[in-house]
């Protein structure tokens, strides 16, 4: 990354951790932000396709461009429906090949997720200020997500913001957690380039006393000075790690839920 874009990566802090600590399994909270750019007029929105401005190029990989008319109040009402614990099967890209794999193993992915917070806030331009678009952030806090969950949530939230679907339809999707229901209603999955992982939080106790203890790969130096890689299997941790791998998507949201009363939420959206 530093070669492609110098000075784009900095180390702000580091911690010494136990050999049994896992950066994925021991996560307490993840904070994702989905950025949207709403055109201030229909002319500006249509010109994006025929005569794109410098703003369009600067935001191309960082926000979802939308036409004017988005109702923020309705968006917020849709966001609030996701608070709490839900079976989010309707917002889960559950592919047939994954279902067959689960059937062979006799292990099935859980789609129960706890959403700490989902809400809309004022955003800002990525590169430079302009008078063409209004920027907004949809922030979602949870320990873990299923594949495509946030992008499907955003598709439903935006659809209600444009008054294309009623709130009752989102409630129905939450009450009828089947993956095919989302496509059956012809809802659009939000594009991936607006989604950003902003913060990952851990309980400092897990740095030194991780629970569960994960047997990571360890480099052992022998008496003759040779180095060997050792991996001792922890079956419970290995099973959970496998479930995490099978539910990851390109943006990294797909970890198995572990109920824990200690929830550490990252700093508020800047």
Task: Enumerate the predicted regions with their spans.
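Structured-RNA-binding interfaces characteristic of tRNA pseudouridine synthases
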Residues: 1-270
């Amino acid at each position: 990354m530093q070669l492609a874009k110098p000075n784009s990566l900095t180390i702000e802090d580091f911690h010494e951790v136990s050999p049994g600590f896992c950066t994925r399994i021991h996560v307490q909270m993840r904070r994702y932000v989905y950025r949207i750019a709403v055109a201030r007029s229909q002319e500006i929105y249509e010109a994006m396709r025929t005569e794109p401005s410098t703003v369009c190029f600067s935001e191309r990989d960082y926000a979802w461009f939308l036409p004017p008319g988005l109702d923020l109040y309705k968006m917020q009402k849709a966001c609030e429906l996701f608070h709490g614990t839900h079976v989010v099967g309707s917002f889960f890209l559950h592919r047939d090949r994954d279902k067959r794999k689960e059937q062979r193993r006799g292990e099935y992915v859980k789609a129960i997720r706890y959403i700490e917070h989902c809400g809309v806030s004022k955003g800002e331009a990525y590169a430079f200020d302009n008078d063409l678009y209004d920027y907004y952030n949809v922030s979602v806090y949870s320990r873990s997500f299923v594949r495509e969950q946030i992008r499907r949530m955003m598709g439903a939230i935006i659809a209600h913001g444009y008054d294309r679907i009623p709130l009752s339809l989102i409630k129905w999707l939450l009450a009828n957690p089947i993956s095919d229901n989302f496509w059956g209603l012809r809802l659009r999955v939000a594009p991936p380039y607006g989604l950003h992982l902003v913060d990952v939080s851990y309980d400092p106790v897990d740095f030194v006393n991780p629970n569960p203890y994960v047997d990571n790969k360890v480099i052992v130096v022998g008496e003759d000075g040779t180095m060997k890689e050792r991996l001792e299997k922890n079956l419970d941790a290995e099973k959970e790690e496998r479930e995490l791998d099978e539910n990851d998507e390109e943006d990294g949201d797909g970890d198995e839920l572990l109920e824990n009363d200690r929830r550490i939420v990252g700093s508020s959206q800047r």
